[in-house]
Amino acid sequence: MKYKAHDYQQYATDFIIEHPVSCLILDMGLGKTVITLTALWLLLFDYFEVRRILVIAPKRVAETTWPAEIKKWEHLYGMTFAVAMGTAGQRKEALLSGADVTIIGRDNVSWMTKNIFFDFDMVVIDELSSFKSPKAQRFKDLKKVRPMAKRVVGLTGTPGNLMDLWAEIGILDMGQRLGRYIGGYRDRFFLPDKRNREIVFSYKPREGAEEKIYELISDISISMKAVDYLDMPECISNRVTVSMSESEQALYDRMADEMILEYGEGQDIDAVNAAALSNKLQQMANGAAYDESGNVRNIHDRKLDALEDLIESANGKPLLVAYWFKHDRERILKRFPARNINTKKDIEDWNEGKIPVALIHPASAGHGLNLQEGGSTIVWFSLTWSLELYQQLNARLYRQGQKHMVIIEHLVTDGTVDEDILRAIEKKDTTQNAMIEAVKARIGGMTDDGRSNDEGI
């Protein structure tokens, strides 16, 4: 795919190239990965500034996002990569492979520093919040080898806690800007907040502390304020692809082929026609499905895992999560401290920024529902065939009065009906006929009532 950079993306890429130490403090969904990869390619093959690059990321991001982005963009052709995941032997093989870019999960940083000679002249830390605790072992171990890299890039969203910035910036510049000790940073920029006599439970920033902190790190960082003056798009639509395991995909494919999954009497998952099959396949793509008795059968947690990554990347910035099936909502609520948007009080709390993760059903997001003050990011956990409901929900945030760029994230399970739905939405063809035709195309030869066109002998 050809990459056409927005102004802010080109600005950020140039910033990385021009600054040996750099930090991109940009909201989730703005393309920090491709921004960084573009800079890495240029530093490797145009400027010959670096020869081996280490990318540290959360496990699932390391396994899927970075490799997928490298393979996705045409302008990154020629860049080799290795993913240091799996067994100790597999990780070691990847780290010693000599690839241009080696990607490792943050949980393996300590293992790497103890078992492999550190031979990287550039480090990229995707999600700096992974290193917000100076007491964490991964922070201490990376700090030891950090001076061996002549270039470093940190990627993060807008911080929800200024106290965390000390460690996050410190791992990049080795304490040059915010000081070498957390105590000095705390005394300089914070005051005790909640306390019990001599025991301080929390701190609050001093007046003007935020402006002063950002001023101190301004020479190495790009924040949302720094790119505000550029020609920023009003809305960005992203696809977050997840993949099922072979066994999970086999269940999905069997349902598509046979229209039934047998679990025992009263527990089967079945479909009687193309429309019902599309519904069941969509449920399975989301991770669970109702059996014939109305009970929920879990298939996988791939979208929940991806949502967890998005929540972490948001750094406390509110997310509005759209779901379609009741079991989607229940599974999300079981895993995350989310809250439904149902009542007037829910709407008020959302608009006041009191709900970090809010759940909403597209059918309940009618015209006149104002949610734009509470956030600017929508995550479609479940997609919908209804173009009207899709546009209607997006318009709850992407509307007059919205002060920030709107990010729309779509969770799409690879090789499933999710891809058909998103394609139909993009083409604005989400009729009942389009849904049935999509199912027919996937499984071949089905009529509307579920019978096969292939009558046989």
Q: What is the role of each PLM region?
A:
Residues I35, V50-K72, G160-D164, F325:
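Conserved Walker A/P-loop ATP-binding site and its immediately adjacent core
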Residues M1-I25:
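Conserved pre-motif I regulatory segment
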Residues M1, E18-V21, L30-G31, I35-F45, ...:
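Conserved Helicase C-terminal RecA-like lobe
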Residues R52, G78, S97, M122, ...:
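Conserved P-loop NTPase motor "coupling/switch" region that bridges the ATPase
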Residues G105, R329, P337-A424, K428:
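Conserved RecA-like P-loop NTPase helicase motor core
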Residues V61-G86, L172-G175:
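Conserved helix-turn-beta segment of the N-terminal RecA-like "Helicase ATP-binding" lobe
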Residues M405-I407, L411-I457:
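Non-catalytic, charged low-complexity extensions flanking SF2 helicase motor domains
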Residues A88-F120:
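Conserved helix/coil segment N-terminal to the catalytic DExD/H
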